[in-house]
Regions:
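Bacterial carbohydrate/catabolite-sensing allosteric modules
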Residues: 1-122
């Protein structure tokens, strides 16, 4: 089964949502969070319940913020290269300004799964 919740991209949101999740679904084995800050908050909440991220419950974030590699356990995350996204956005805006035709444009940004210690067989 799967559970999908929306949340703000904050540590506190991760803490709050993890407590909700554990109380409603105590047998959960993994979390995929919409941002690293949410994932970091979820890890803090797990540790406050004497559960170990990566051992008891796998946690994966999204963004690869600097704190992701500095916490214990280090956070598994998807890195999306915001510099590359910004460059693509700037180029797209300039093309739209300078061209009269506006065909649909598709760009691919290759995300990278960075495997650290917060995810494992749980």
């Amino acid at each position: 089964w799967k559970v999908i919740w929306t949340s703000e991209d904050t540590k506190q949101s991760g803490v709050d949502r993890l407590h909700d999740l554990i109380s409603e679904h105590p047998d959960v084995t993994a979390l995929i969070c919409n941002g690293d800050m949410v994932a970091l908050g979820a890890c803090l909440a797990l540790q406050s319940k004497n559960l170990q991220p990566g051992k008891d419950i796998s946690v994966i974030g999204f963004d690869n913020v600097m704190d992701a590699q500095l916490v214990t356990p280090s956070l598994t995350t998807m890195a999306v290269n915001p510099y590359n996204l910004g460059q693509i956005l700037a180029e797209t805006i300039l093309k739209r300004i300078n061209e009269t035709e506006h065909p649909q444009i598709t760009y691919f940004n290759n995300p990278e799964l960075i495997i650290r210690n917060s995810a494992g067989p749980a």
